Amino acid sequence: VFEPKLLEGARLLHINGRHENTCRDALRHAQAQNIEISFDGGAGRFRESIRDLFEASHVRIVSRDFAEKCSGSTDLTAMAAKLIQPPARLLVITEGTRGSHVWRPDATHFHQPAFKAEPLIDTTGCGDVFHGAFLHGWLSQWPLERCASYASRLASKNAEGLGGRHVLSKERPTLNLEL
């Protein structure tokens, strides 16, 4: 059961559809308060039963696998055209080591190359770090290019250590990664 008080002061609700009913409840409360919705569509996670959650979101950051299954296309441009429909304000399709592609509703887009993790130790949590870093930039009203670069760089840094929270570890309290 979603507790509406969790949205007090929120500017964005980030959902992934994993707990569908809770996500729907949270989404309804966020919509009633005009809170922006972001959606995380991970690889292997698309299901028709969560399409409504995806389609209600404003900021859509999804893996290429999710984008292909949700759009029914394997062509990147065709996928984007289908997935950037209103109310979307932004679409990001991630491709891991091949970087990410960022689209605006007017169909302008760019490719953000991935940063190389050296050494590459563990990719656990890199997608979550990418999402969090990108959304930090989005909420800070950074240019999209800066959001994408920052997210890509921070995700690569996460892969240089063990576990999904490497970049948040006490051994590395600050990362001078802002561009």
Where are the language model's segments positioned?
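Conserved phosphate-binding/catalytic region of the ribokinase-like
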Residues: 12, 74-179
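Ribokinase/PfkB-type carbohydrate-kinase core domain
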Residues: 1-110, 142, 170
